């Protein structure tokens, strides 16, 4: 009886030590992630598509009423892949807010994200590939190496590569 009690007591102490070590490690990770001077903390949100501002032109003239569709593919679950829509104003101007998600445990897992970004433009029954890009970071504004995301999309332009992205839009 006495050996069984001692064995349980030793087992309980081992479990407590392991639990304390795990709690300590998680606390250190959270504090490290929240510390200033780091680009992204453990609890920061994941930026799947940075804020976008742009203008749609046709032969250099602003296009009013063009529909823009912004898509992100970052998960095998289609319900987790967001889509946003907007329409250009009289000056051909459009904007999309950033698409962000909660980090959850993803910040603790060392991995290279693969995020497929797409912007399509629909105008007068024609669909144009405005922007295709493979984003490899959860940080904001990494699409254009830290610059704000500003585009000029010329509908008469043939889609082509510009840096790491493809489409009719040029970064300005």
Language-model segment annotations:
Residues 1-14:
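N-terminal secretory signal peptides that target proteins for export/translocation
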Residues 38-149:
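Beta-strand-dominated extracellular/periplasmic modules and repeats
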């Amino acid at each position: 009886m006495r050996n069984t009690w001692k064995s349980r007591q030793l087992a309980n102490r081992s479990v407590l030590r392991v639990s304390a070590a795990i709690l300590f490690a998680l606390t250190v990770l959270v504090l490290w992630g929240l510390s200033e001077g780091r680009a992204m903390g453990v609890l920061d949100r994941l930026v799947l598509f940075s804020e976008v501002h742009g203008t749609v032109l046709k032969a250099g003239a602003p296009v009013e009423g063009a529909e823009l569709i912004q898509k992100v593919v970052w998960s095998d679950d289609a319900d987790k892949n967001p889509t946003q829509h907007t329409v250009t104003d009289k000056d051909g101007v459009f904007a999309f807010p950033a698409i962000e998600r909660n980090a959850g445990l993803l910040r603790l897992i060392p991995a290279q994200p693969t995020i497929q970004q797409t912007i399509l433009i629909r105008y007068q029954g024609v669909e144009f590939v405005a922007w295709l890009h493979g984003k490899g970071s959860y940080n904001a504004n990494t699409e254009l190496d830290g610059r704000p995301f500003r585009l000029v999309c010329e509908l008469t332009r043939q889609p082509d590569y510009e840096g790491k992205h493809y489409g009719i839009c040029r970064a300005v």
